[in-house]
């Protein structure tokens, strides 16, 4: 109570956590005493509320010395300490030394006092609510905070010899942090580690993806048992970078500290993905009449969001932002034509006051946009706000998804669009559904992993005050999903803070239906909170709305409601995954002034002069409109509030709410609990007895001085917190409630109350002042009947169903009236109200205030609904305005029987006793503890779901809080299921002990160095979200673990025979890998007393999780938990690890009930480019723990034979990249040196081969195999045998189907040495003729007919295969370089020649033919990539993968292959073709990590250089940062060869909505349908023929080529139906063919109907931005300048997101040669283009009928061969013959008219000699089959 006065200034310290007075230091203790007593405290784990500040430790022996400052040239050590100069201190190596500047005594005392006093208030407020102070030392004034710590190391001898007088020296960086100057005097002393151990350390990182296992390893390697300081840079494995942002010791920020085994690291990401939800509820359009007059949305767009974005910019954060506007719209049934048979496909029928159906709307404003473009984001937000209300309010009756009255669809002319909806209140909004939607994509977080951003944060901005009415199913499902996915939510409220605990979710738990119910029909009917009852809370007044418009059952109940009834009592829960903030622009402005040290700024938490006599806290719009100051004044009484205090109302007639029934403004200043605001009967007698007239009260308040106010508050506190002796005697089975907590302060809120509420207040006032002092017994049973108010003279505790003042009853005794339904602009429908009549009932739907928890049921404390009796016999939709009286401390004085101003005792809530003996005894909390419920009751939840009917005897139970109890509690299965995530509490009187309980924050408890304050904005979380902590203390009790969990044990041991895979060698390594795997999947290591008590191992309480040696001992136990799953790892004898999985029973038993009614969610969604809202069916099932941990652990241990597709079975992290061919310019060829004769296509293939060479060099080889491999290294061959074809894979497979029934092992593996050792050749003893015979013989190199584009080359071999042959069969050739050199010698001697005589011999995909003089006649040429085999052999399942054909026949169904899993077996009648291959790749060749870092690298085996080359990476437990480094090096290499490495989604574009609900492809249709396409040419190496049907998408493909799209993946239907095509990563399941723009920013698919589906590639910007920022470290130092300027792989996007909107523009404008067609397509493809620019130009073209007709006419029928684009014609072109083979052979197969037709139609053939082939001609390339060597060769 000591700080009550200072706390009066602002409501921002009104918290649901320990208040600041519990954290401050007693002022009575002198700084000297504090400083000296510090030595006596040795407890490392100091509690936040301890009263002493420990500043130093250990010894008082101090030495004064001179401190030097040195630079790196002097020494690289941060601190040099001459141990010999401090021999008197007995300093040893390894001791911790404290450096403190010498200060004058006055300075020390002054700084200490400032810390003990104002520091705890002012600075802590500034840290959480404002920007950093200009002076960095302003926050670190005390010795504890500003001291410099270091560990003693030996001084180098050379420095000691050169500088014998050196005592201590620090670097400039350290001196700047601690404020040291050269030659300054400092005090040196030895301190104990325990006194300088940090409790929490904030570690920030950005631009990298870190899994939590990497964080664990980083701490073990770089931080554990070391001294750390603020601003310290951390580098782990030379790649992972982080910065120490804050260090906390006992809740205070310090500059340095010791990272002890018990220090908790808190990692915060500065490059996260933010999803901002803005709840566009009804209140968002309310005007702030007492403030600026703006609507609440202005607070978002002009206040909160700009401030948030500015803070992001100031901290250099690189977040991706998605903003979604959402609301729930209620429709007027009368406007729709009466009651409608609403189906799930139309509108959901949710019970509301008028039984209105509802629909949820979501409008995506921006998606994954870089936070740096915040001005653009705000502009878009403003534009969408203008039309949002219009769009969601208009109901189009002609929509097929909107039913009519008779259920049939009618024409638009009969049913035009009508305005039939209005947004619901924030209280009843769809907040949980929105959060669940945002987190849904995290279930697929392992797919398409972004390697730049870490963490996902969801911010929900609501105009409400943090109270929401939800359904049990949605709360449970959302909580479970968030708990499993390890993310938390930030809730930002625009309304003032209520007077109770927040954030608050009120729900009704399902109960079993019974045949008979004591609750009547209404109870037996039941309803879920989805069936919104007549409880229409508004969002801003902490009052109850006892509106009983519904009795009995009602129509429209779903199957779920018929199966399971709802409990009649409200439950109240605070989820640990939701962090709440309150945005107050005025308070923020004050905080900014304080931060800027404005001398006129108010001092926080001090009493200042009141600026107004009366500041209304409830806005009553209707009252303002009806002349309240005139005739209505005598009938209407406005509750008089103070600092956010709620409306006060009488609890009986004697208090009448007339002019004499108002309370003073100063009534509940500090210690008012929420329920204290609800009834004047609870106000202290000394104050209530003096109230005569509200106007007098107002004037009296104006005259009060602050001292008088404080005196009154003290008087009130003394009255409130007296022992409840008399009350306890009058209660049954109850005990006194704890006093209201001081930190729950009154909110400085402008609360709002609608006219309906005031009218009912007036009505009740009329009834209550009629002279009848007693309430008649109601004749109609009401749900809330047991909420009783003592009657007049003698309050009777056994009164049966006493009438409540605020209870609206449909009784005949009540004067009939109609409440006004139009309270402000958006409440635009309803019956026209008669003249308003006052009533004490407050309709919370319109009373816009902090909707509190206790509003609807007496169970308003977060008590278990089964524990406290509901008010049987009263309407459950109604509640007394004094319900909460039972939750409030009772008045200490007996209630006089005559005085009208005498307050009665609080109303109690009856709870039926379990046994008759318990009726007269209070319930002992220690006997019936409840860990999650604040209700202490002896009444268990009965099996039939009903309660004992003894509640009719009157309420006799009072709520208590027991959040901290560890004993098992009596809870229903429903509450047990919810308990881990949502804590049930009493919101109106939450115990301080409960709020201080660290387990209050659940899995996030270790993320808080000190208790957070509710009322302030959590800028730290909003700027850089915390990653889920590595440790937790949350653990079930022994009883719960034994009874509520299923156990599954198994054992794991390392595989002794790994067979070439990376496996842990010892049990310790295996244990670390198993823990790392669980940490990366969201598990937390459990520590603390709870797990130690349950397991019986005290060592677990202080487990050092950063010391793996202690974890690897025999018998060592580690517990890890995630949601409802607990894993126990025990090291047992024999080198094994025993794993026991504990799975909660209710998670499976209740799952069915939750999914039945809530799984299918049908909101109306409008994505970025959509023109209207469309319904989407979304399943919101919670993620079940279906991960097979037994398989995963054994896979880690090396037992992998039982898994045929581990990447999918074990949910590997997966990413996919494509290499996109880009056009090369002339100046880009300079660095290619000798390859200037290569054309563009050859250079691209050369780049792919260069990458394969890197992959081969860094492929993973187990250590045991390296010994054997080193001897054979000279004979090693590149295993990445990629086959290059100029047709698409489906065409190759179709054309070669007759020849690929058998696969050639040589294509996949290095061919065995063909010649025996004795027959190996030597270069010196071989003749050309004999060598020619051997080469063309059976043991020679493979000769076959090969086609390249339109040219056929007979009996040729490939340079890369011939190089391998020479290396394997020549004894004196030891390397591929020597083989190439020998091949050139053979070529010079005329043994063979290039098919087009353009190249010398190269190790690549170059075609060569034996010269005619050495050629051996062959009866039949091998015209396939595969050798002719005998047909009686079986086809291996891993067979030929590169066999093509032009198959444009889309005859067979797609669906049968879409869902088929990849299996190693093949169909009996189908050939199996594998089109990709996998290799183990080592991403850590420099061995920076202490473990193998291996990934699975999948690459194409069959590639068309005109298309994308596919790369897919998958890994299980590898460090992602090392993977990113490897990818960046690949990108740098590929860029040199004109290839752009781009990350793309794994799934096809049309399936994006399955994993990301806020995204949808954009459809573009052709204005003019294209004519039938040409008949495709099905050709192979022997024939050309016109077969099959025409390609109906021929013109679509041509149009995509025109706009620089290249083929990514073909549709599954494009492959022959009799061939089973698969990839090493799985079966292709693309429904439509997919193309990608050369910029990588846009994907497009062609549907069967001929439409285009466009989708922006969100992954390209993050990938390339990172490549630009980090690429300089990876092979960029040797890049020519002209390459660095290219807008290719490494050009930055400046955080531009490729989202589809006209918001992003290209950064660079680099010119390029104009294509011969005259189109700037190639120019645009060379620079990054935001996808909307490409889309706009493409859509404009498709909508132009004339241009389309012209395009169709000039596009002649010809076989399509997509090209990269034109390249300059080289000098050598004219000297290359068209074909080497004789004309007689060529003319038989190649028709010359096709050449002419193709060239003329294309229009891009330059006018050159016929022998010259331009690169841009898709028919005839100037090059021959080519691929280039593995690395640049200097060939003369």
Swiss-Prot record:
InterPro entries: DEP_dom, DEPDC5_CTD, IML1, IML1_N, WH-like_DNA-bd_sf, WH_DNA-bd_sf. Residues 16-31, 962-975 have a biased composition (Polar residues). One of its GO terms (biological process) is negative regulation of TORC1 signaling. Residues 36-51, 749-766 have a biased composition (Basic and acidic residues). It comes from the Eukaryota. The keyword Cell cycle does not apply. Residues 794-813 have a biased composition (Low complexity). Its main location: membrane. CDD domains: DEP_DEPDC5-like. Gene3D superfamilies: Winged helix-like DNA-binding domain superfamily/Winged helix DNA-binding domain. It holds the Pfam family DEP. Residues 1-51, 727-816, 886-975, 1421-1471, 1814-1836 are annotated as: Disordered. GO terms for cellular component: GATOR1 complex; vacuolar membrane. The keyword NAD does not apply. One of its GO terms (molecular function) is GTPase activator activity. Residues 1337-1412 form the DEP domain. Keywords: Membrane, Vacuole. SMART domains: DEP. This is Vacuolar membrane-associated protein iml1. It comes from Aspergillus fumigatus (strain ATCC MYA-4609 / CBS 101355 / FGSC A1100 / Af293) (Neosartorya fumigata).
């Amino acid at each position: 109570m000591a700080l009550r006065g200072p706390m009066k200034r602002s409501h921002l310290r009104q918290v649901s956590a320990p208040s600041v007075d519990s954290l401050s230091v007693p002022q009575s203790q002198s700084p000297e005493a504090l400083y000296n007593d510090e030595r006596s405290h040795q407890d490392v784990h100091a509690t936040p509320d301890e009263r002493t500040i420990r500043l130093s430790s250990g010894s008082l022996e101090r030495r004064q010395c001179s401190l030097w400052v040195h630079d790196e040239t002097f020494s690289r050590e941060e601190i040099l300490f001459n141990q010999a100069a401090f021999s008197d201190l007995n300093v040893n190596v390894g001791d911790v030394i404290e450096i403190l500047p010498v200060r004058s005594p006055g300075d020390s005392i002054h700084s200490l006092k400032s810390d003990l006093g104002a520091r705890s208030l002012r600075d802590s407020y500034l840290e959480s609510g404002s920007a950093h102070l200009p002076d960095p030392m302003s926050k670190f004034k005390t010795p504890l905070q500003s001291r410099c710590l270091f560990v003693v190391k030996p001084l180098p001898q050379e420095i000691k010899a050169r500088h014998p007088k050196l005592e201590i020296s620090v670097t400039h960086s350290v001196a700047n942090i601690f404020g040291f100057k050269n030659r300054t005097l400092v005090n040196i002393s030895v301190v104990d580690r325990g006194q300088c151990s940090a409790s929490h350390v904030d570690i920030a990182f950005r631009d990298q993806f870190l899994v939590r296992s990497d964080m664990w390893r980083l701490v073990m390697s770089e931080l554990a048992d070391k001294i750390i300081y603020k601003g310290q840079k951390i580098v782990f494995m030379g790649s992972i970078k982080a910065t120490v942002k804050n260090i906390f010791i006992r809740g205070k920020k310090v500059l340095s500290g010791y990272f002890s085994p018990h220090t908790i690291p808190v990692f915060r990401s500065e490059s996260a993905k933010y999803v901002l939800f803005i709840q566009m509820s009804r209140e968002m359009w309310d005007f702030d009449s007492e403030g600026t007059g703006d609507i609440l949305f202005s607070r978002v767009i002009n206040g909160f969001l700009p401030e948030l974005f500015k803070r992001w910019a100031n901290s250099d954060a690189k977040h991706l932002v998605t903003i979604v506007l959402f609301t729930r719209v209620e429709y007027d049934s009368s406007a729709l034509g009466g009651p409608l048979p609403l189906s799930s496909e139309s509108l959901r029928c949710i019970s509301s006051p008028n039984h209105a159906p509802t629909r949820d709307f979501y409008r995506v404003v921006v998606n994954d946009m870089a936070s740096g473009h915040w001005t653009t984001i705000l502009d878009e937000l403003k534009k969408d706000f203008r039309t949002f209300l219009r769009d969601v309010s208009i109901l189009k009756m002609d929509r097929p998804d909107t039913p009519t009255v008779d259920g049939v669809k009618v024409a638009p002319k009969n049913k035009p669009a009508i305005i039939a909806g209005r947004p619901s209140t924030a209280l009843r909004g769809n907040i949980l559904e929105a959060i669940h939607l945002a987190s849904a994509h995290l279930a697929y977080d392992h797919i398409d992993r972004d390697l730049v951003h870490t963490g996902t944060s969801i911010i929900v901005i609501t105009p409400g005050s943090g109270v929401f009415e939800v359904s049990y199913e949605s709360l449970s499902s959302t909580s479970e999903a968030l708990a499993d996915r390890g993310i938390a939510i930030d809730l930002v409220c625009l309304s003032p803070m209520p007077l109770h605990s927040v954030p608050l979710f009120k729900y009704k738990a399902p109960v079993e239906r019974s045949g008979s119910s004591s609750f009547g029909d209404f109870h037996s009917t039941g309803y879920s909170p989805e069936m919104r009852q007549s409880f229409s809370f508004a969002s801003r007044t902490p009052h109850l709305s006892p509106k009983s418009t519904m009795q009995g059952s009602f129509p429209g109940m779903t199957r779920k409601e018929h199966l399971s009834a709802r409990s009649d009592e409200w439950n109240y829960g605070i989820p640990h995954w939701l962090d709440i903030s309150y945005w107050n622009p005025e308070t923020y402005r004050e905080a900014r002034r304080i931060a800027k040290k404005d001398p006129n700024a108010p001092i926080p938490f001090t009493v200042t002069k009141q600026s107004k006599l009366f500041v209304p806290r409830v806005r009553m719009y209707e009252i303002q409109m009806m002349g309240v100051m005139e005739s209505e004044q005598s009938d209407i009484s406005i509750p008089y509030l103070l600092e956010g205090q709620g409306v006060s109302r009488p609890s009986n007639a004697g208090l009448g709410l007339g002019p004499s029934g108002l309370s003073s403004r100063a009534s509940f200043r500090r210690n008012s609990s929420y329920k204290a605001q609800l009834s004047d009967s609870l106000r202290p007698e000394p104050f209530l007895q003096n109230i005569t007239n509200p106007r007098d009260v107002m004037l009296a308040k104006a005259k009060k001085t602050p001292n008088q106010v404080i005196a009154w508050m003290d008087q009130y506190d003394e009255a409130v917190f007296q022992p409840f002796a008399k009350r306890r005697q009058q209660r049954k089975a109850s005990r006194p409630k704890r006093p209201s907590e001081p930190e729950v302060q009154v909110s400085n809120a402008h609360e709002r109350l609608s006219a309906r509420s005031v009218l009912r207040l007036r009505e009740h006032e009329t009834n209550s002042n009629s002279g009848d002092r007693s309430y008649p017994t109601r004749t109609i049973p009401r749900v809330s009947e047991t909420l009783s108010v003592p009657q007049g003279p003698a309050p009777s505790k056994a009164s049966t169903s006493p009438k409540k003042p605020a209870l609206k009853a449909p009784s005949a005794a009540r004067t009939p009236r109609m409440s006004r339904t139009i309270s402000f602009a958006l409440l635009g429908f309803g019956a026209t109200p008669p003249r308003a009549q006052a009533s004490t009932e407050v309709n919370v739907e319109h009373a816009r205030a902090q909707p509190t928890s206790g509003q609807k049921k007496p169970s308003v404390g977060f008590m278990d609904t089964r524990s406290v009796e509901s008010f049987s016999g009263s309407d459950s939709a109604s509640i007394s305005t004094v319900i909460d009286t039972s939750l409030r401390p009772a008045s200490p004085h007996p209630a006089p029987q005559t005085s009208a101003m005498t307050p009665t005792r609080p109303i109690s809530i009856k709870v039926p006793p379990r046994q008759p003996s318990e009726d007269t005894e209070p319930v002992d909390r220690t006997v019936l503890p409840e860990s999650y419920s604040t209700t202490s009751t002896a009444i268990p939840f009965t099996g039939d779901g009903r309660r004992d009917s003894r509640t009719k005897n009157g309420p006799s139970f009072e709520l208590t809080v027991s959040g901290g109890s560890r004993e098992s509690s009596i809870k229903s299965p429903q509450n047990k299921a919810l308990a881990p995530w949502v804590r049930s509490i009493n919101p109106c009187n939450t115990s301080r002990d409960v709020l201080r309980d660290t387990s209050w924050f659940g899995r996030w408890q270790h993320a808080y160095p000190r208790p957070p304050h509710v009322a302030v904005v959590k800028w730290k979380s909003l700027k850089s979200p915390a990653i889920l902590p590595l440790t937790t203390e949350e653990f079930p009790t022994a009883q719960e673990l034994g009874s509520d969990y299923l156990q599954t044990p198994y054992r794991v041991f390392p595989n002794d025979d790994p067979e070439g895979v990376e496996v842990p060698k010892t049990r310790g390594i295996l244990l670390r890998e198993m823990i790392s795997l669980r940490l990366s999947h969201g598990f937390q290591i459990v520590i603390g007393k709870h797990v130690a008590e349950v397991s019986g191992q005290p060592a677990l309480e202080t487990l050092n999780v950063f010391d793996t040696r202690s974890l690897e001992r025999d018998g060592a136990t580690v517990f890890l938990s995630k949601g409802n799953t607990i894993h126990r790892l025990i090291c047992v004898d024999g080198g094994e690890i025993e794993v026991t999985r504990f799975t909660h029973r209710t998670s499976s038993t209740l799952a069915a009930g939750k999914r039945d009614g809530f799984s299918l969610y049908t909101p109306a969604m409008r994505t970025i480019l959509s023109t209207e809202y469309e319904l989407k069916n979304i399943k919101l099932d919670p993620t079940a723990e279906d991960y097979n941990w037994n398989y995963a652990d054994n896979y880690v241990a090396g037992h992998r034979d039982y898994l045929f597709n581990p990447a999918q079975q074990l949910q590997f992290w997966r990413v996919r990249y494509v290499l996109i061919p880009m056009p090369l310019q002339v100046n880009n060829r300079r660095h290619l040196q000798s390859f200037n004769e290569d054309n563009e296509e050859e250079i691209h293939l050369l780049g792919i081969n260069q990458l394969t060479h890197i992959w081969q060099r860094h492929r993973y080889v187990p250590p045991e195999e390296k010994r054997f491999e080193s001897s054979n290294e000279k004979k090693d061959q590149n295993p990445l045998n990629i086959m290059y074809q100029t047709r698409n894979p489906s065409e190759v497979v179709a054309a070669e189907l007759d020849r690929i029934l058998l696969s050639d092992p040589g294509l996949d593996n290095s061919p065995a040495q063909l010649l025996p050792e004795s027959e190996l050749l030597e270069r010196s003893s071989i003749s050309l003729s004999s060598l020619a015979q051997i080469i063309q013989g059976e043991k020679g190199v493979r000769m076959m007919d090969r086609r390249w584009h339109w040219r056929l080359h007979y009996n040729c071999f490939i340079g890369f295969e011939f190089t391998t042959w020479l290396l394997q069969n020549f004894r004196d050739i030891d390397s591929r370089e020597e083989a190439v050199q020998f091949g050139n010698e053979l070529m010079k001697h005329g043994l063979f020649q290039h098919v087009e005589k353009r190249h010398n011999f190269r190790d690549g995909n170059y075609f060569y033919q034996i010269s005619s003089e050495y050629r051996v006649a062959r009866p039949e040429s091998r015209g396939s990539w595969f050798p002719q085999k005998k047909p009686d052999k079986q086809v291996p399942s891993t067979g030929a993968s590169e066999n093509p054909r032009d198959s444009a026949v889309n005859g067979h169904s797609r669906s049968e292959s879409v869902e088929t899993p990849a299996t190693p077996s093949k169909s009996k009648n189908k050939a199996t073709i594998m089109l990709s291959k996998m290799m183990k790749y080592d991403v850590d060749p420099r061995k920076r990590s202490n473990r193998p870092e291996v990934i699975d690298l999948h690459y194409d085996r069959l590639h068309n250089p005109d298309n994308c080359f596919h790369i897919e990476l998958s890994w299980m437990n590898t460090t992602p940062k090392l993977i990113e480094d490897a990818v960046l090096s690949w990108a740098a290499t590929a860029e040199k060869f004109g290839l752009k490495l781009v990350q793309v989604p794994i799934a096809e574009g049309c399936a994006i909505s399955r994993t990301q609900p806020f995204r949808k492809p954009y459809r573009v249709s052709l204005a003019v349908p294209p004519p039938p396409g040409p008949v495709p040419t099905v050709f192979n190496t022997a024939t050309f023929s016109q077969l099959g049907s025409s390609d109906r998408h021929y013109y679509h493909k041509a149009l995509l080529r025109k706009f620089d799209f290249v083929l990514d993946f073909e549709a599954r239907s494009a492959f022959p139906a009799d061939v089973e095509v698969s990839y090493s990563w799985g079966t292709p399941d693309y429904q439509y063919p997919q193309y990608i723009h050369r910029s990588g920013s846009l994907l497009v698919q062609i549907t069967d109907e001929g439409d285009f589906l466009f989708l922006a590639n969100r992954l390209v910007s993050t990938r390339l931005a990172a490549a630009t920022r980090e690429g300089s470290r990876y092979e960029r130092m040797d890049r020519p300048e002209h390459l660095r300027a290219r807008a290719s792989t490494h050009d930055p996007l400046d955080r531009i997101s490729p989202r589809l909107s006209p918001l992003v523009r290209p950064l660079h404008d680099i010119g390029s040669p104009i294509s011969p067609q005259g189109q700037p397509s190639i120019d645009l493809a060379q620079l990054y283009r935001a996808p909307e620019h490409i889309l706009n130009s493409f859509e404009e073209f498709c909508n132009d009928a004339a241009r389309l007709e012209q395009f169709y006419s000039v596009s002649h029928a010809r076989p399509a061969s997509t090209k990269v684009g034109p390249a300059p014609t080289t000098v050598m072109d004219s000297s290359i013959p068209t074909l080497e083979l004789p004309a007689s052979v060529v003319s038989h197969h190649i028709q010359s008219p096709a050449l002419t037709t193709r060239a003329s139609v294309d229009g891009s053939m330059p006018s050159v000699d016929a022998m010259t082939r331009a690169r841009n001609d898709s028919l005839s390339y100037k090059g021959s089959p080519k691929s280039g060597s593995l690395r640049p060769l200097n060939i003369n």
